[in-house]
Amino acid sequence: MKTIKPQTPEGNEKHTPMMQQYLRIKAEYPTTLVFYRMGDFYELFFDDAEKASRLLGITLTQRGASNGNPIKMAGVPFHAVDQYLSKLVKLGESIAICEQIGDPATSKGPVERKVLRVITPGTLTDSDLLPEKSEQPLLALYSTTQRKTATIGLAWLSMASGVLKLMEFATDAQNADVRLKHELERIAPAEILLPGSVNDLFSEFSLAKNTTVPDWHFDIAHGTKALYEQLNVGTLTGFGAENLSAAIGAAGALLRYAQSTQGKGLQHVRTLTVETENEFIGLDAATRRNLELTETIRGQDANAATLFSLLDHCRTAMGSRLLRHWLHHARRDQSVAMARHAAINALMRADACSGLASTLASVPDVERITTRIALLSARPRDLAGMRGGLQQLPSLRAYVSMCNKDADAPLLKTIHDALATPSDCLDLVERAIAMEPAAMVRDGGVIARGFDAELDELRGLSENAGQFLIDLETRERARTGINNLRVEYNKVHGFYIEVTHGQTDKVPDDYRRRQTLKNAERYITPELKAFEDKALSAQERALAREKYLYEQVLQQMTQHIATLQNIAHALAQLDTLVALAEHALRHNWCAPQLVSEPTITIEQGRHPVVENHIERFIANDCLLSSECKLLLITGPNMGGKSTYMRQVALITLLAYVGSFVPASSAVIGPIDRIFTRIGAADDLAGGRSTFMVEMTESAAILNGATENSLVLMDEVGRGTSTFDGLALAWAIAKHLIDNTKSFTLFATHYFELTQLPEIHPTAANVHLSAVEHKDSIVFLHAVQAGPASQSYGLQVAQLAGVPQPVIRAARKHLALLEANSMQATPQFDLFAGGGSPTTVESAAEPQQASAVDEAIAAINPDALSPREALDALYRLKELSNQ
C-alpha cells in the first residue's frame, strides 16, 4: 500500500489540504469504508459517514465545508474501534484503517497518513472480530469453458490459520452451477473473489460477500509465480497442483488480495493442500440441514440441539473448530477414521480423558496466536498466552505417552512427536514477556524485568519518582513551615506543589505559580521542574524502548511459525479426540467397524442428539446389505420414522468422522454420499413451492446417488394430489431399487407402496409400532418387520389438541371415504407390468375392516341415548354389509 503524502491533486484546489489528502486515500478504496485517524478518533466523511451512521447508530454531524459543500462526518473513538468493526464485518462491510504515521508536532500541513490494513469478512485475524469456533475462509473462483465443458477452479484460505487449499473440477456447463453450489456450501466462505467480468455462473451466488477484482488478477502465469514465491518452491508437482490451471489462477488472485489487505506478506501460509472430488463423503446443503450437524433445521446454531453442540466437549477453540470441520468433511478413506477410532479407544482404555481435559483447558488458541505472530499483529497477552500453552506441552506429552504404551494408536504417536517443546521459543517468551502484561504495548509494562538493562534503568528513573516526591514534600514542609503542603502529579499539569489559600503568604520566592484553584494554588520550583523533565523523559523513552523490544521479540518469534503451527494442529487433534472419547464413555457408545463389503448393519442404534434430551430412548436395529438395499418404513405420524432414518445416517456419518457411535454394534461398508429428502418447506425467496422443493431435492438424489450412497426419503409425493404423489413415490422408489441401487430408507404413508417387496426382493417392509386404546394412541417407537396397519392420523390430531367436534367430523368423513373407496372402481395398477386396468377389490378388504373399526372407535357409549345407540348399531350393520 502506498503512503499518501500531502500534495495538491489536479482539480482539488478548492478542498482544504486535509480533505485533499482524505480524497486521495478514498479514491484508492472507493467501495470500502475508510476509517481516517484524527487524534483519538477514527472519522468517516461524506457517503461513508452516512452509511456508518445508519449501520452503527452513531451521530451524523457536519465539519465545515469543502469545495463549497458541507462535509458530513461521523466518528468512533479509537480505543473502542473493535466493537464497531465487528458489527460492520458481520453486516458484510469492508473497512480500510488509515493511521497517522507522521508526527503532528513536526508536520507542516496535514499529518502523513497511510492505510495499514483492510478488514474484510474473509481476511479477519483479530480475536475480537472472529467467531471462536468456526472458520471464515476467503475464496477465489475462476472458470473456463470449452466445448460445453466448464472447468472451475477454487482456491480458499483461512487467514486465521494459514491453511491454503485448491480444488478444480470439470463438469457440463449447463449443470456447473449445481456442482459449484455444492462445493461452496461445503467450504462456507465468508467472502468470494470473482473476476470483474463476472459471468452468469457466479452472479447468482449470495452465500457470502462477493468482491470483484480485475480479470488480470486471475492470470495463470501470475498465479503460478505467486504460489512459487509464497511456498518457496520451484514446482507445484509435490502438491499435486501442477495441472490445475483454473485453480492456480484463482490462487493468484486470492494471494494478491490477501496480501493487500494485511499490508504485508503472509508468513504463516507455508503449504498447500489439493482437495479432490472423491475425497469426502458428499453432503449437500439439504442433508447438512436435515441432519442438523452444526445448526438446526430452523437455522439456529448457538447452544442449539445439534450434533456439534452435543459432541463439543473441547477445551480449546482450536479443537472445536477441528471438530466442526470433521463433521462436515468426513473422509471416504476408511483408514483415516480407523486411526481416530484406535486413538479414542486408547484414550478411553487409559482413563486419561479427565487429566488431559483439565490440562488442555489452560491452553490458549495457539493456532490463531501463531497467525497474529506471523502477521506481526500479536498483542502482549497473546504472547503471554502462548507462553502458558507451551508450558503445558510436557504434561500433555506424558499423558499421550501413557495412553499409547501399547503402541496401537499411530495417530497418538504422531501427536506425541508434534508436542515436543520448542525450547528456544519458550525461553524467549519466558524471559521477554511480563507475567501479567498490559493489553496494549502503548500502555507499558509488557517487557519483563531483567530482559533489557536499558529499559530497567529507564523504568528505575520513572519509578523512583514516588520516593523523590515524598522526600521533597518532607523537605519543603520543613523549609516553609506549611504543614499541609502536598507534592502531586497529574497528566495535564505534570508535577506541582499544592498550597491552600490560607498558607500562600508563607510561599518562598523560588515558587512559580502553575495553576490557581478555588481553594488552593499550585506551584513549580526549579528543582521540581528539573526532576519532571528527567522523569517524564525517562517514561517516554521507556515506552519507546519497550515498543522496540516487543517488535524485536515478535520478529524472533516468526522463526518458529512452522513449529508452532504443527503444535497447534496436534493440540487441536488431541482436544477433539479427548472430547469424542469423553462422550463415548459417558453415553456408552461403541467403536464401529468399517469394512469393504456393502452393508449398514446397526444393532440397538440410537439417535445421538435425541437420546440426550429424553429420559428413555428406544434403540432399534438396521440391516441394509446387497440382499436388502431398501427399507420401506410405514407407521403413524409422530411414531419416530424420521428420527429412525436420521439416526441411521448420523451413525454412518459418525463412523466415518472417526467417532464412536450410539449403538451396541455397527458395521459400515463403503459410503460415498449421504442424501436426505426430509421435511417440507417453501422457498419463497427462490419462488419455489413446497412440492417444487421436494422434487428438486428428489431429482438431485436420483441424478447423484450411486450404489455406495445412503439415501433418506421421507414422505415423497405428499405435496401434490394423492394419485400424482403415489405415482411419483412408486416410480422414485422403483428407480432407487432397479437403477441406483443405493442403501435407501423410504418412509411413506402410501400403503400401496408396501407391495414393492413382493416384486423386488432387495426391498423390505418395516414399521414403527403403536398401540391404540379407545380414542388414544401410545407410540412404542420400536422398528418391527412388515408394513403398518394404519397411520393413526386422527389420533395424532387429537393429541395435538384439535377440538373434539373437528375430530368427530373427521371420523365420520373418513368412514364415508373408506366406504366409497370399497366400491370397485377401475384404477390404473401402479404395480402391473402393462397398462391394463384393474380393480382395488383386493385392497378393499382391509380398508372395509378398518372402516368398521373406525366407526366403532368413534362411538362413545356413555354419551349415547338408547335411540342414538340403536342408530349406531344400524350404521355398523350397513358398513359390514358393504
UniProtKB/Swiss-Prot annotation:
Disulfide bonds: none annotated. GO terms for molecular function: ATP binding; ATP-dependent DNA damage sensor activity; damaged DNA binding; mismatched DNA binding. The keyword Manganese does not apply. Keywords: ATP-binding, DNA damage, DNA repair, DNA-binding, Nucleotide-binding. The keyword DNA damage applies. SMART domains: MUTSac, MUTSd. GO terms for cellular component: cytosol. It comes from the Bacteria. PROSITE patterns: DNA_MISMATCH_REPAIR_2. GO terms for biological process: mismatch repair. ATP binds at G635, P636, N637, M638, G639, G640, K641, S642. Belongs to the DNA mismatch repair MutS family. This protein is involved in the repair of mismatches in DNA. It is possible that it carries out the mismatch recognition step. This protein has a weak ATPase activity. PANTHER family: DNA MISMATCH REPAIR PROTEIN MSH1, MITOCHONDRIAL (PTHR11361:SF34), DNA MISMATCH REPAIR PROTEIN MUTS FAMILY MEMBER (PTHR11361). This is DNA mismatch repair protein MutS. It comes from Janthinobacterium sp. (strain Marseille) (Minibacterium massiliensis).
